[in-house]
Structure formats: C-alpha cells, structure tokens
Curated annotation (Swiss-Prot):
GO molecular function, one term: structural constituent of ribosome
UniProt name for this protein: Large ribosomal subunit protein eL21
Entry annotated with the keyword Plastid: no
GO CC terms: ribonucleoprotein complex; ribosome
Any GO BP annotation: translation
UniProt keyword annotations, A-Z: Ribonucleoprotein, Ribosomal protein
Coiled coil: none
UniProt keyword Ribonucleoprotein present: yes
Family in the record: Belongs to the eukaryotic ribosomal protein eL21 family.
Organism expressing this protein natively: Sulfolobus acidocaldarius (strain ATCC 33909 / DSM 639 / JCM 8929 / NBRC 15157 / NCIMB 11770)
C-alpha cells in the first residue's frame, strides 16, 4: 500500500469549491482594489482559482484583524482556539467584515 499524501490542499474537495456561475470568473475588481487599513476586520475567504498568497484551509471563514501590510499582502491576526496567529494573505482571499465583532 502507498501512503496517502498530505498536501497543502488536502481535504478541500468541498471547502474550496466554487458555485457553477462563479467558475472561470476573476474576483470583483472592487475587492481586489480595496485598501484595508490597520485595525479593520476582514473575513478570510479563500479563492481556489488563485493559488498565490492563499492561507491554509484551517483559516477559511475566520474573521481577523488587519495588523499591517507586507508587499501586496496583508498581515491578519486570527484567533484559533485560545491562540493568536498572524497570517500573510493577499487581498484576493479577503473580504471586508460587515458584522459585529465581539471580543
């Protein structure tokens, strides 16, 4: 028997799936051009068609705080359990958070 591969995108068959009408489309320019400022809340929403600057699947759907900018990417602080992680994510995988964030 051959050992099962455990790659970076393993177990993402349904998680990184696009709807039929979204396939082949590039993200909205308004989302790509959006300039996030420090202290702004964002949602990590992975775009599976763009591999560059993609975070791990563990962080998909998490709400984080923009800490800074590194090149074209943003540093986003996300809480996983009782630990804080700082992710380096490109804007293709971020959307603005419009809800209420409780701390």
């Amino acid at each position: 028997m051959v050992a099962r591969s455990k790659g970076y995108r393993s177990k993402t068959r349904k998680l990184l799936e696009k709807k039929v009408r979204e396939k082949g489309a590039i993200p909205k320019l308004s989302l790509l051009m959006h300039d996030y400022s420090q202290g702004e809340y964002v949602v990590v929403k992975i775009n599976p068609s763009i591999h560059k600057g993609m975070p791990h699947r563990r962080y998909h759907g998490k709400v984080g705080l923009v800490v800074g900018k590194r090149g074209k990417a943003y540093e986003v602080k996300v809480n996983i359990g009782d630990k804080e992680r700082v992710l380096i994510v490109r804007p293709e995988h971020l959307i603005p958070f419009n809800g209420i964030q409780k701390r």
